[in-house]
Structures are given as structure tokens and as C-alpha cells.
């Protein structure tokens, strides 16, 4: 059961957690802060479902050769709506259309503790929280099982995440026609532990909790000079130029804080699994 080097090769995608019939698999944080599965041997019945959906063990089955299919570039035409997003803003109109069709959206939000987590919702206010980049690996929780249940009930669902998370969603659900997979263009995900230590250090420095973060704010300059903005509980904003001054973003761009599987990712580039 998941008999390989988890710290080196696991993607922390949560597919195994979402298919275990006995709840014997849960995610824990490794020493580097990355999510890896831990199996409760007392509850495990050896059914092998975790191995069958493991995207690392079956990486060759989850690839969509983008180079052969071709692709299009697009961006949100509404200037104000685009400002609320980190890049071209295409997630939001796709999600809005899914809601108009009576469907659900699964995406990443900040929870009350300012941890990145995936949620499933058909409410516009939740979808608005999913906008903008979160430069940290999210906790997928039980979302994949929830998505599978909705798909089986005939509901259309849009799932948005990293390429490895999209592969996990496809593996758990069987990738039916009513599932729309939307992948980020990913260069690697900093571990949750790294973000949590940075967040807590800044909260201690400012003397109050962090309530919001924008890694690529288009205020005050715009697209060409994004700012890293932390907002504390009192509403005060603390900002630095993302690519020149902020140590968290700079460490990420230099590839210093990724989970280990990111350095030999089997799903990036043309090896994606999204629509």
C-alpha cells in the first residue's frame, strides 16, 4: 500500500484519502511541511484502492498531450474583474458559467486560519474566494469524494487546481463528461508548512493576525509590477514588490520551497491532464 518513497515521489494530491473505504488514510505534514499520506494499519483492509488511484504509480495514464491538441490564449475582457485576479482572470467567467448551468465549482480558498484549502460550492460568494493565486499547496481534504458524488448525481462540476490535483480528480472520479478540469500553469508549489511558518512570523511581527494575502496585487502599479500585500486584522495593508522585495515569493521563484515531487513532476508542461 503506497509502497514508495512518499517524501520524494508523493504529490500530496489526496486521491488515496478520498477513495479509502475505511478512512484508514489521512494526510499529515512531513518535516519539510509537505502533505503526505499516513496509513492507519489497524483500519486498513488491504483493498488496494489507494494504489489504484495513486497518480505517481499511474502517471502515464493521466496525460493529455497538449502539444498535439493545440491551445488558445484568452483573458477576461472586463478590466475591473481582471484586476481581482492574479493574471488574465479566466477562472471566474468559467466558474460563473458553471454556476449558470446549475453546477458546482471546486477550487482553492483561504480558510479562517489562512491555510489554503479546497472547497466545493455552488454559491457565487464562495467562487469569488477562489479567485487569485495562492502560492502554496492546498489541502484537498475530502473534496474529490464530494465531487465524485455530485458527478454521479448528474451535476456538472468544474474542478480547478494544479496539474497533479487535476490528475487526482480524474483518477478518483473516472473523468466523466460532466466534469470540467481546469489546471493552473504550475511551476511548483511551496509546501504548506513553509507558508504557515512565514504567515505566523509576519503575524508576530505585526502583532495581529493575518486576514488576507494577495501574492500578485495589481495595485498600486498594475500588471507589470505586481505587489505582495498582507492585510492584518485591523485592516492595515503591508505591501512589497512581489518579484523584487518579498522573501516568500523570491524563495518560490528560485525553487527553494517546493515539495520534493515538484522537482521531477510528471504532470507539468505537455503532460497535463486537464481540459
Kindly label every feature range from the protein language model:
Residues 1-7, 38-42, 245-253:
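Short, intrinsically disordered, charge-biased short linear motifs at domain edges
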Residues 2-3, 9-11, 15-32, 36-38, ...:
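Iron-sulfur cluster-binding cysteine motifs and their immediate structural context
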Residues 1, 15-37, 134-137, 229-247:
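Short, charged low-complexity linear segments at domain edges
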Residues 41, 47, 120-121:
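Glycine-rich loop at the start of a catalytic domain that most often binds anionic cofactors/ligands
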Residues 58-275:
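Iron-sulfur-associated redox domains of electron-transfer enzymes in respiratory
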Amino acid at each position: 500500500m503506497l509502497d514508495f518513497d512518499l517524501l520524494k515521489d508523493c504529490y500530496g494530491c489526496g486521491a488515496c484519502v478520498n477513495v479509502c473505504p475505511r478512512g484508514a488514510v489521512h494526510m499529515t505534514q512531513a518535516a519539510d511541511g509537505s502533505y503526505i499520506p499516513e496509513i492507519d494499519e489497524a483500519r486498513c483492509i488491504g483493498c488496494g484502492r489507494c494504489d489504484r488511484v495513486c497518480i505517481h504509480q499511474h502517471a502515464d495514464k493521466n496525460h493529455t498531450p497538449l502539444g498535439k491538441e493545440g491551445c488558445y490564449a484568452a483573458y477576461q475582457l472586463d478590466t475591473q474583474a481582471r484586476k481581482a485576479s492574479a493574471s488574465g482572470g479566466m477562472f471566474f467567467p468559467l466558474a460563473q458559467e458553471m454556476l449558470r448551468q446549475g453546477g458546482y465549482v471546486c477550487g482553492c480558498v483561504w480558510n479562517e486560519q489562512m491555510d489554503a484549502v479546497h472547497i466545493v460550492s455552488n454559491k457565487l460568494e464562495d467562487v469569488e474566494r477562489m479567485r487569485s493565486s495562492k502560492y502554496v499547496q492546498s489541502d484537498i481534504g475530502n473534496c474529490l469524494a464530494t465531487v465524485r458524488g455530485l458527478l454521479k448525481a448528474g451535476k456538472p462540476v468544474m474542478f480547478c487546481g494544479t496539474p497533479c490535483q487535476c490528475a487526482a480528480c480524474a483518477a478518483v472520479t473516472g473523468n466523466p463528461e460532466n466534469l470540467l478540469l481546469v489546471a493552473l500553469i504550475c511551476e511548483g508549489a511551496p509546501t504548506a508548512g513553509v507558508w504557515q511558518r512565514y504567515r505566523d512570523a509576519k503575524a508576530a511581527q505585526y502583532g495581529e493576525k493575518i486576514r488576507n494575502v494577495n501574492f500578485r496585487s495589481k495595485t498600486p502599479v498594475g500588471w507589470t509590477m505586481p505587489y505582495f500585500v498582507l492585510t492584518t486584522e485591523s485592516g492595515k495593508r503591508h505591501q512589497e514588490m512581489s518579484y523584487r522585495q518579498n522573501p516568500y515569493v523570491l524563495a518560490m521563484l528560485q525553487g527553494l520551497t517546493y515539495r520534493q515531487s515538484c522537482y521531477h513532476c510528471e504532470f507539468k508542461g505537455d503532460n497535463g491532464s486537464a481540459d
